[in-house]
C-alpha cells in the first residue's frame, strides 16, 4: 500500500519495444499499485509498424523522431526508467532510450 505521507510518489518511465504491449499494460498496473506514477507509451493496442503503415516513409520517420523526442522528455521527468525486455529483447530504439537515460543521470 502506498505511504499516504509520501510527499511525491516516484515517477517511473517504462521503456521497451511496442511489440510487447501486454508487457506495458502489466508493468503499468504493477507500478501504479506499488504507488508510483507511470509514464509510458500511448497505445491504441496496435504496433507502430501497423499503426503508421498508411504513411509515407518520410512521414513515418518524422513521426518516429517526434515520438522518440517525447519519450526522452518522459525520461527527463522520471526518477527511474524501467526497461521491459520481454524474452531478453531490447531493440535499437530502446537501447537508445537506455543510453539517453544513462547520459542524463536517470537510473535504469
Language-model segments: which ranges?
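Conserved catalytic or regulatory cores that recognize and/or transform ribose-phosphate-containing ligands
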Residues: 1-108
Amino acid at each position: 500500500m502506498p505511504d499516504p505521507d509520501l510527499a511525491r510518489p516516484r515517477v517511473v518511465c517504462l521503456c521497451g519495444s511496442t511489440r510487447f504491449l501486454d508487457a506495458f499494460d502489466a508493468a503499468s498496473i504493477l507500478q501504479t499499485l506499488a504507488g508510483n506514477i507511470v509514464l509510458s507509451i500511448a497505445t491504441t493496442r496496435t504496433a507502430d509498424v501497423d499503426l503508421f503503415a498508411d504513411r509515407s516513409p518520410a512521414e513515418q520517420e518524422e513521426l518516429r523522431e517526434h515520438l522518440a523526442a517525447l519519450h526522452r522528455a518522459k525520461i527527463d521527468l522520471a526518477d527511474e526508467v524501467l526497461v521491459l525486455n520481454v524474452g531478453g529483447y531490447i531493440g535499437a530504439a530502446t537501447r537508445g532510450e537506455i543510453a539517453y537515460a544513462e547520459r542524463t543521470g536517470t537510473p535504469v
